[in-house]
């Protein structure tokens, strides 16, 4: 049975594997579309973890942990070479 929701309006987790290539081609890959996607993601994160009634440190600590992991991954190449040095 065909889905009642058009393919363009489906979320990624609702798309079947056979529909995935056509769903990807329907996405907006212009700079404004990509900026809009990042904006929606930021708004979703902000409303879920930061802008809550009983807020805690968890939302900000997740961002901080992601920053630490990301910066470690970026500087891993230099850290790998420093690990083998004995004196300098």
Curated annotation (Swiss-Prot):
Source superkingdom: Eukaryota
Keyword Transmembrane: yes
GO cellular component: mitochondrial inner membrane; mitochondrion; nuclear membrane; proton-transporting ATP synthase complex
Keywords from the named record: Acetylation, ATP synthesis, CF(0), Hydrogen ion transport, Ion transport, Membrane, Mitochondrion, Mitochondrion inner membrane, Phosphoprotein, Transmembrane, Transmembrane helix, Transport
Biological process according to GO: proton motive force-driven mitochondrial ATP synthesis
Family membership: Belongs to the ATPase F chain family.
Quaternary structure and interacting proteins, as annotated: Component of the ATP synthase complex composed at least of ATP5F1A/subunit alpha, ATP5F1B/subunit beta, ATP5MC1/subunit c (homooctomer), MT-ATP6/subunit a, MT-ATP8/subunit 8, ATP5ME/subunit e, ATP5MF/subunit f, ATP5MG/subunit g, ATP5MK/subunit k, ATP5MJ/subunit j, ATP5F1C/subunit gamma, ATP5F1D/subunit delta, ATP5F1E/subunit epsilon, ATP5PF/subunit F6, ATP5PB/subunit b, ATP5PD/subunit d, ATP5PO/subunit OSCP.
Protein name: ATP synthase F(0) complex subunit f, mitochondrial
Organism per entry: Mus musculus
Encoding gene, per UniProt annotation: Atp5mf
């Amino acid at each position: 049975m065909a889905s009642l929701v058009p393919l363009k309006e489906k979320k990624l987790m609702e798309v079947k594997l056979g529909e995935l290539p056509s769903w990807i081609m329907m996405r907006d890959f212009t700079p404004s579309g990509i900026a809009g996607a990042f904006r929606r993601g930021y708004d979703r994160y902000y409303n879920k973890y930061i802008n809550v009634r009983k807020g805690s440190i968890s939302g900000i600590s997740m961002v901080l942990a992601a920053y630490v992991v990301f910066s470690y991954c970026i500087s891993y190449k230099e850290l790998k070479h420093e690990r083998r040095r004995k004196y300098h």
